[in-house]
């Protein structure tokens, strides 16, 4: 048996023995495990799965061992991902730091930063949020105004960030700040990390139409940030931001691989609400559902293939924008089909004769509209595709 096949056999046996059966099914609303200083578990099995994967180094299996990873090569990491999918294992934790900031730190961070920031990520001990968008700097991110004034051994940060996911629950933030107000808007930006408990940081949740408040506005009033928390070169944050956004779009485009609350299996739901389609209209709904499910399956296979290409060293950065755009449209299409199939059952809210699943689907439909903006607006993705994939010139 060659080493890869041997590793696959060992991995399969370990997962069969260590992933509790309850952690091999879709995650209900409220059971996500977020890596954090005050991590919460819905049940003992979730904690057991978290601890076993953490101790194995499989939160970040392809990260170096010295930072808490398992040091797996791309080929071995692909085997692990394949076996996790085969068994339908839940993600042991959700951690934006691992998905987005971590790869940037591995590439651009100092050795001290890697030791201080990466290790807590690989142990699920810190919850991260992203400080990019501002009230007047969304799609045009380089127009940001939040300033970081040089004060000797530290920066003094003033301004605000908006649409910060889970800012009220996060331990740390990675943020873009303006460190040179006189430079061109792309040239005077730096990337820093800061403790959300620092004096001068305040957070205000934003109420959403879905009834939830995942987004926040964060205010900075004279916040002191040590210069050791500057990531990469001073005034060089824009290039790091572009790299980080590539990882963000990759993470968002991979959501379909995970059994997250909004990842509803379409065809079983169609069978549930239309057990025996009657007439042309219901038959047409079934046909739409089958087409949507096939598109979703094709998308997931493409994401897996792109992951293999990326691990083999191929440049897939431009393709990430394509996948993010496709994912957005597929989610909207899927929930539109569900709304039509479920009829009045799709009107579920907090109260009334609706199941938790029906209420979650209604919220998923509302959230699907926001996907056209979050993680990079669809219009921005089209511009990236035009330039980086199709090679079209700028139009002045």
Segments (PLM) and residue ranges:
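Glycine-rich phosphate/cofactor-binding loops in nucleotide/flavin-utilizing enzymes
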Residues: 79-80, 100, 240-247, 252-256, ...
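C-terminal helix-coil-helix/basic helical segment that borders enzyme active sites and/or dimer interfaces
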Residues: 27-31, 275, 280, 297-353
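N-terminal glycine-rich flavin-associated loop
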Residues: 93-112, 138
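A short, Trp-centered hydrophobic/proline-enriched beta-strand micro-motif
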Residues: 124-132, 176
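Glycine-rich beta->alpha junctions and the first turn(s) of the following alpha-helix
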Residues: 201-301, 371
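A structural signal for short hydrophobic beta-strand segments in well-ordered beta-sheet cores
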Residues: 146-149
């Amino acid at each position: 048996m060659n080493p890869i096949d041997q590793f696959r056999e060992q991995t399969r046996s370990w997962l069969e023995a260590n992933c509790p059966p309850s952690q091999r099914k879709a995650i209900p609303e409220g059971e996500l495990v977020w890596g954090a200083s005050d991590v919460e578990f819905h049940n003992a099995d979730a904690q057991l799965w978290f601890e076993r994967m953490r101790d194995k180094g499989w939160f970040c299996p392809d990260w170096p061992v010295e930072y808490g990873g398992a040091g797996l090569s791309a080929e071995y990491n692909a085997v692990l991902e394949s076996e996790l999918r085969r068994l339908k294992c839940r993600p042991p934790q959700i951690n934006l730091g691992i998905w987005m900031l971590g790869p940037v730190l591995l590439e651009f961070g100092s050795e001290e930063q890697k030791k201080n920031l990466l290790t807590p990520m690989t142990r699920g001990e810190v919850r991260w949020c992203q400080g990019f968008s501002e009230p007047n700097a969304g799609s045009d991110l380089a127009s940001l105004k939040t300033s970081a004034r040089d004060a000797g051994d530290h920066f003094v940060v003033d301004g605000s960030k908006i649409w910060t996911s889970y800012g009220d629950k996060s331990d740390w933030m990675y943020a873009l700040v303006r460190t040179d107000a006189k430079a061109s808007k792309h040239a005077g930006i730096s990337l820093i990390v800061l403790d959300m408990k620092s004096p001068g940081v305040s957070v205000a949740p934003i109420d959403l139409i879905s009834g939830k408040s995942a987004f926040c506005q964060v205010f900075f009033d004279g916040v002191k940030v040590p210069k050791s928390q500057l990531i990469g070169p001073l005034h060089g944050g824009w290039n790091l931001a572009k790299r980080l956004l590539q990882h963000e779009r990759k993470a968002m485009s991979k959501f379909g691989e995970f059994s997250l609350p909004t990842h509803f299996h379409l065809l079983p739901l169609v069978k549930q609400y239309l057990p025996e389609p009657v007439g042309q209209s219901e038959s047409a709904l079934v046909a739409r559902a089958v087409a949507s499910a096939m598109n979703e399956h094709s998308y997931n296979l493409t994401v897996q293939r792109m992951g293999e290409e990326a691990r083999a060293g191929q440049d897939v950065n431009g393709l990430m924008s394509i996948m993010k755009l496709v994912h957005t449209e597929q989610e909207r299409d899927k929930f539109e089909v569900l709304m039509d199939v479920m009829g009045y059952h799709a009107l579920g809210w907090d109260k009334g004769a609706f199941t938790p699943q029906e209420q979650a689907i209604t919220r998923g439909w509302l959230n699907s509209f926001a996907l056209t903006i979050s993680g990079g607006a669809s219009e921005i993705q089209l511009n990236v595709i035009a330039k980086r994939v199709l090679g079209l010139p700028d139009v002045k």
